[in-house]
Amino acid sequence: PSGLALDFGAAPGGWTRVLRGYGLRVVAIDPAMLDPRVARDPGVTHFKGTTQEYMRQGERCDVIVNDMRMDAMLSCQIMGEAAGILKPEGLAIMTLKLPHENQQRNARRAMDLLSKWYEIPFARQLFHNRSEVTVLLRPKRRWAAD
């Protein structure tokens, strides 16, 4: 990938470092502080606000990573809004944070909601953290930013 990546819930900056390793410019979106090594990177812009505040600017992007610590359904709603700024050929990686009870049902509900805006070519529950599911998303044509 090339171009601009958005890192939702970026602090302390793990995903931002990965994205920079692929040569992407990154807007790290989080009210919390970034690791100083990440913050000093000239290819990183730290937006110290919420994802919703940032998206109001309407800047289109090539990649979105969402690792926000919040209710999975709320995070999915935010990804629905983000479909409007993700370029048609773009991709998103999202981590669903699931409560311990009813994980399978909650994961299914979240993916059903995401499928309104995205194709879901891949989803995997991580072995080391059974309460998270990582999902790869591609925007459906009608939602993507042209």
Ranges and model annotations:
Residues 12-17, 73-77:
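Short glycine/serine/threonine-rich phosphate/pyrophosphate-binding segments
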Residues 76-143:
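C-terminal substrate-binding/active-site "lid" region of AdoMet-derived donor-dependent transferases
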Residues 20, 64, 85-88:
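A generic alpha-to-beta junction signature in SAM-dependent methyltransferases
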Residues 4, 25, 91:
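Residues at the starts of beta-strands that form the adenosine-phosphate
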Residues 2, 60-61, 89:
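Local beta-strand N-terminus motif with an aromatic residue
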Residues 25-66, 71-74:
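S-adenosyl-L-methionine
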Residues 7, 65-66, 94:
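Redox-cofactor binding/interface segments in oxidoreductases and associated redox assembly factors
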Residues 2-11, 18:
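Conserved class I S-adenosyl-L-methionine
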